[in-house]
Amino acid sequence: WAGIGLGKGTVQELVTKIRRNRKAMQHWLCTDLLVIDEISMMTAELLDKLNGIGKKLRANQQPFGGMQVLFVGDFYQLPPVYKNGEQTVFAFESAAWAEAIHENMELTIIQRQKDVVFQAILKEARLGSLSKQSCEIIHAREGLDWKQNKILPTLLFPRRSEVDMINE
């Protein structure tokens, strides 16, 4: 959508890149509401760049060039992706966030999980503090042959190198 790839370069370099891409330019000029999902994975640096790009391309000094913005995500889940061991700053710590976001909402009702015990385990995991009972429930699942299940599990890895190995 944005036409900036990984967002490397200065705001001006990215603006120049977008101006050469008719489709991306149309996105920036015709969008009234910009929705960014999984905002927890975006760095403060990239969010600030998007804000600057919006202002320049739309010739409007309001946040994001006057677009409304809706950020969706859970900062307890996935942090920004770190490159080369560099720790990055969360999007909510950016200048763009301070400038643009005036209201935060928290959704508190779990819609996709009906198992109350599993909900409790997920809440503990989200907060980084599993009880002994939750650990026992999880450990009881160890050794089960997940390949027998008709629903294949999502595989999660803590390191990019492990993800790259699986994706090869």
Model-assigned labels for residue ranges:
Residues 1-168:
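Conserved ATP-binding/catalytic motifs of P-loop helicase motor domains
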